[in-house]
């Protein structure tokens, strides 16, 4: 059946988006700061810039194009005063160097689907960054990552699905979906030695604080 206008409004009331060019697409979708700002400003429901960053694992785009695109996104996020969502793979030093370049310009950073080292986490915390955990933290071979999230303060942690990828244990191998988020949340609660309810409250508050939503 068709939804009423009010029902449609209710469905999207608490839904938000971000705008950016993934590093895989940096070659074929070049974009500058002003274009990013224009697209983000089209809709008040767009609350961040990204996912952007550097991926030197797949190298679907050349490094120069990735770095140029990343820096344009950084500049746009600063001018818009909105968080930038970072994808970083096999590019820890380069990612930090670019972000650190703008540390005195009130840049707001979210390290998306964080799987980086403890050393990078420490440096990113000096930039007042947030870190988002995906289902990867539930995997058997993620002991080091679990230790890293144990070190990261709870008030700097968010939880994500990365759907349709990275379904958490016990749903690993299946197409990921939002309903599986609870497994990642429960695992993070164990890492932090608090209840899932407390973890849910903390991560929700962190999201609202970072993205300035009620």
Please annotate each region the language model reported.
Residues 1-12:
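Single conserved hydrophobic/aromatic residue that forms the stacking wall/gate
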Residues 16-19, 47-52, 155-164:
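Non-cysteine beta-strand/loop elements that form the S-adenosyl-L-methionine
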Residues 23-31, 37-127, 147-148, 152, ...:
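Divalent metal-binding pocket/active-site signature
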Residues 128-140:
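His/Asp/Glu-enriched short active-site or ligand-binding loop at hydrolase and phosphoryl-transfer sites
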Residues 179-214:
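Mid-to-C-terminal alpha-helical segments outside catalytic/metal-binding sites
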């Amino acid at each position: 059946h068709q939804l009423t206008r009010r029902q449609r409004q209710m469905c999207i009331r608490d839904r938000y988006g971000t705008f950016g060019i993934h590093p895989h697409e940096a070659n074929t979708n070049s974009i500058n700061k002003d274009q990013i700002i224009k697209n983000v400003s089209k809709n008040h429901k767009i609350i961040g810039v990204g996912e952007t960053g550097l991926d030197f694992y797949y190298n679907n785009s050349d490094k120069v194009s990735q770095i140029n695109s990343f820096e344009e996104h950084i500049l746009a996020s600063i001018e818009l005063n909105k968080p930038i969502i970072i994808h970083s793979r096999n590019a820890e030093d380069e990612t930090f160097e670019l972000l650190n370049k703008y540390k005195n310009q009130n840049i707001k950073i979210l390290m998306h689907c964080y799987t980086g080292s403890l050393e990078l986490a420490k440096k990113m915390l000096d930039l007042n960054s947030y870190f988002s955990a995906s289902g990867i933290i539930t995997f058997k071979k993620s002991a080091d990552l679990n230790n890293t999230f144990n070190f990261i303060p709870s008030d700097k942690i968010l939880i994500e699905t990365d759907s349709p990828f990275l379904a958490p244990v016990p749903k690993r191998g299946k197409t990921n979906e939002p309903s599986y988020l609870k497994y990642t949340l429960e695992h993070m609660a164990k890492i932090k030695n608090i209840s899932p309810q407390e973890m849910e409250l903390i991560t929700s508050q962190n999201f609202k604080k970072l993205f300035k939503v009620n």
